[in-house]
């Protein structure tokens, strides 16, 4: 009986650590509605004042709006991403101009610890080490309970 409780405790700790990962970096993928041409790694076609504009490989921040089906793309502001993967219509805000996306596009979010920008100067190594120590401690505690 005590072994079952310890295993449940271990599973709960692992789940808590995994779900604590935050997502803010994202990549937008889509297809040109006119030519069906795709761009690698990503492409978005937006319409502003009747003109079709292509945005290829756009990275930025995702912000939830009051509408649960739309999000704001904010290139330089702080923001959070709703989840690791989602598909929705977006309202983009490059250069502080609202641009409505003409189609439903995919939003692929990257975990903050795996930022695609390659900037390692943020000092996230200490938080990663703290997370590893905490998870190792939780596993040790669960194993000790299992041995009792």
From Swiss-Prot:
Glycan-carrying positions: 67
**Topology term for the membrane:** Lipid-anchor; GPI-anchor
Q: Which residues form the propeptide?
A: 126-148
Q: Which residues form the signal peptide?
A: 1-20
Keyword annotations:
Cell membrane, Glycoprotein, GPI-anchor, Lipoprotein, Membrane, Signal
Family of this protein: Belongs to the ponticulin family.
Q: Output this protein's name.
A: Ponticulin-like protein D
* Organism ancestry: Eukaryota, Amoebozoa, Evosea, Eumycetozoa, Dictyostelia
